[in-house]
Structures are given as structure tokens and as C-alpha cells.
Amino acid sequence: MEKDPKVAAQVKLILKLIKELSPGNTVELRIPGYGAIQCVAGGNHRRGTPPNTVEMSGPTLVKLISAPELWTELVASGLISASGIASDLSPVFTHAQALYEAN
């Protein structure tokens, strides 16, 4: 399956924004086929996969950055897999939305 270049470019930009807005290594944000970052300060995780993980598709990430209020709905529907006590990234996406729209 070939990646949509437009989605790939958007995912790259979104991951960069999230990493800049919320640096750290408490949560791993995974977008299979596109990339993954570690973000959110506060934990003392140092090696391997953090105990808090969030995974979604590229198109779901693009949808979420445009409508961060959909976080709960997307998690409930299974389009976002979020595990761990620090895995709620909805505040990060709310903050990132304005920066994303400015680009």
C-alpha cells in the first residue's frame, strides 16, 4: 500500500509540532508507516518503549489536529489506541491546532 504524499507531509509537520510543543519522553506517539516520536515531559523513562503509548493512522492524525475535540470519540471508536495514565494527548493537540493552522 502506497502512502499518500500529502498525508505523509502533514504527518511529518504535525509530529514536529507536537515534539516542539511537548518535549519529553513520557509518551510515544506512533503513526505506523509514517513515524513515531516521544513527547510529554514529566516521566523518568530512559530506554525502550515508554509505558504510555498512543497509536493512530496518518489520516486520523490529520483529522485530530484539525478537530482536537474529537479525541474521546476517536479513542472510543478504536481509531486511536491510547494506553497508560499519561496517554491523553488531547491538551497537546488542542494547543498544536492553532500552530498547525498557521502553517
Show which residues each predicted segment covers.
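Feature captures hydrophobic
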Residues: 1-103
